[in-house]
């Protein structure tokens, strides 16, 4: 089996795949223009969507593309072919995204940047830090990643509101709402977290009018696409 890897971390992916199956014939790189001939001989491609899109525009068609990203927006462009199987990376980003968001939330509550500046300037910082318990969090996007984030934040005693296109009861959210409810739900939020993908349906959800409804002290974290 011949496999094409189009990834900036192609060496790592190639090493892992070869260790798992030494019989694989792997062609790997991060410059589509240098791999056109090799790509035409590979029916299976593994790679990041922006590089895969460049290869598709060269007229080379795979049978199956496995994206290394959760998002596949570059592959949805109107000028690209759609006559192949496309799968994306799922089930691996929940922990990473939870840690990413928690880092910013703790830094915000503990006023980390201001305290660091005081420390560098050899100044005593007497500000009282905040905490996460009881904070109102609105998470927009309650798929696999959103649920993983909610489970992490629930351990800190935060009050969680989930927003989805088709809301349904989900643990550990305290309540659920639809996108039509978003304007009302953000009014009491201490944190507004976006986890939505970049699709035509998600354009212009966050606008001046929505942000005007947030409390002055609220923090918006965009971890979506």
State where each predicted segment sits.
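N-terminal glycine-/charge-rich "phosphate-binding" loop or analogous flexible N-terminal tail
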Residues: 1-44, 157
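Phosphate/diphosphate ligand-binding glycine-rich loop within oxidoreductases
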Residues: 41-116
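NAD(P)-binding Rossmann-fold cofactor-contacting core
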Residues: 155-172
